[in-house]
Amino acid sequence: MPSSALLYCLILLAGVRPSRGEYPRNESNCTHFPVSQTHMLRELRAAFSQVKTFFQKKDQLDNILLTDSLQQDFKGYLGCQALSEMIQFYLVEVMPQAENHGPEIKENLNSLGEKLKTLRMQLRRCHRFLPCENKSKAVEQVKNDFNKLQEKGVYKAMNEFDIFINCIEAYMTIKMKS
């Protein structure tokens, strides 16, 4: 009899769902993500506006780093990987170098980086936004072009950060519809 009672308890517990406020974090974040998406992008844009003029003045190059092919990757099947790789690119390569170009912007760049990290964390919690494995050739091209520009690459990449935010928004909008 004790084993059947244990089996009954296990079946009962398996059917019990958590109350409304007790969903696992990732499921809750996925449910509320459409609401927070607009807020996160607004915060990213506001943080970027604090450093945008600095980098626009320093960027003397006519070429575009974040090309149409990258934007197409964001809208296509490689969108997940392009987003993931570009966030990593800005956090690991661009922003640390950018901090060295002006102590007056370091605090604002740190704030921008933290907001980007928060976005990445929220995207990862809701697996349908970052379920990716493949590499994006467009991101590789951006990285190669960035490295070829040497010191000027930082100015170019930071000057085009608003294009990156627009790519993030386009990607998330597509994912919200699917």
From Swiss-Prot:
Q: Name one GO cellular component term.
A: extracellular space
Q: Where on this protein are sugars attached?
A: N134
Disulfide bridge map: C30-C126, C80-C132
In Pfam terms, one family for this protein is IL10
Gene3D superfamilies xref list: 1.20.1250.10
Instruction: Specify the signal sequence span.
Output: 1-18
Q: Name one GO biological process term.
A: negative regulation of B cell proliferation
Q: Which GO terms describe its molecular function?
A: cytokine activity
Q: How does it assemble?
A: Homodimer. Interacts with IL10RA and IL10RB.
Query: What is the protein name given in its UniProt record?
Result: Interleukin-10
Give the organism, scientific name: Meriones unguiculatus (Mongolian jird)
Recorded name of the encoding gene: IL10
